Amino acid sequence: MTQPLRIVFAGTPEFAAQHLQALLDAGKSIVAVYTQPDRPAGRGQKLMPSPVKQLAVQHDIPVLQPQTLRDPAAQAELAALQADLMVVVAYGLILPQAVLDLPRLGCINSHASLLPRWRGAAPIQRAIEAGDSESGVTVMQMEAGLDTGPMLLKVNTPISDEDTGGSLHDRLALLGAHAVVKAVDALAAGTLTPEVQDDSLATYAHKLSKDEARVDWTRPAVELERLIRAFNPWPICHSTLNGETLKIHAAQLGEGRGVPGLILDASKAGLTVACGEGALSLTRLQLPGGKPLGFGDLYNSRREQFAPGLVLGQ
């Protein structure tokens, strides 16, 4: 009987933890887990372990949390594990060539896009923002470039008009977890045929920033509606009204025209705001110190605050 692959898993957030759970459920031999150092979180700024570390500890898997993998001592520690394969999912540290070369079968990565489209840090949100009709997960053999390695397996899923960054994230985490298990089995059996990426088709999913979440009402309503969905649950689009920050959790295309940012209509159905082209109906908002509410609930108690003729973003 062939020996099971000795797998080292490297990942940090919940997206990665779901991949680790799938490998454990499939009975894979995880000899160690690499994850980012514990970070301060919450109001008390207590050091919190990553979701991947929490899962590894539950399963008594050794956890390593180096600040960098460029350090010869950290590389020696990894080499001592004698891994056949390293599975990397949203780890957050760059793997130098010396690390990529250590496992017998190299390192594979689960990336939340249909490569070569949306290489980089925020593929889920950028796909929604751009109006893509589908997304997916690509499992690839890692190389030194950013998400440039040969593709081993792809799984796709349609992007619906209701999808948010959060809903698509959750779906891709599930798809990716199954895909990684399938890829590991195929690698062990030697049945995978790597497909080289066409660099001419590559696009880059730049990291999200809070500055991008400030709504520019001169943009077309169609673009802003996609941005609001893409940036939910983080960083959440926002604007200002009456000197207060207004977080916009949900919106849909509305009717009407006017100066960008002008409130055209307010009703329990939504707050209709003019854009550079068309209008948006804001349906779920959050005021400072409050929680997200359907606009109907806000309208009942603060009708005068959302009067037509007022302008957002000033």
Curated annotation (Swiss-Prot):
Residues that, per the record, bind (6S)-5,6,7,8-tetrahydrofolate: 113-116
Keyword tRNA-binding: no
Its EC number(s): 2.1.2.9
Pfam families membership: Formyl_trans_C, Formyl_trans_N
GO MF term set: methionyl-tRNA formyltransferase activity
UniProt xrefs under SUPFAM superfamilies: FMT C-terminal domain-like, Formyltransferase
Reaction catalysed by this enzyme: L-methionyl-tRNA(fMet) + (6R)-10-formyltetrahydrofolate = N-formyl-L-methionyl-tRNA(fMet) + (6S)-5,6,7,8-tetrahydrofolate + H(+)
Keyword entries, A-Z: Protein biosynthesis, Transferase
GO cellular component: cytosol
UniProt KW Protein biosynthesis keyword: yes
Family stated for the protein in its record: Belongs to the Fmt family.
Stored HAMAP family: Formyl_trans
Cited function: Attaches a formyl group to the free amino group of methionyl-tRNA(fMet). The formyl group appears to play a dual role in the initiator identity of N-formylmethionyl-tRNA by promoting its recognition by IF2 and preventing the misappropriation of this tRNA by the elongation apparatus.
Protein name in the entry: Methionyl-tRNA formyltransferase
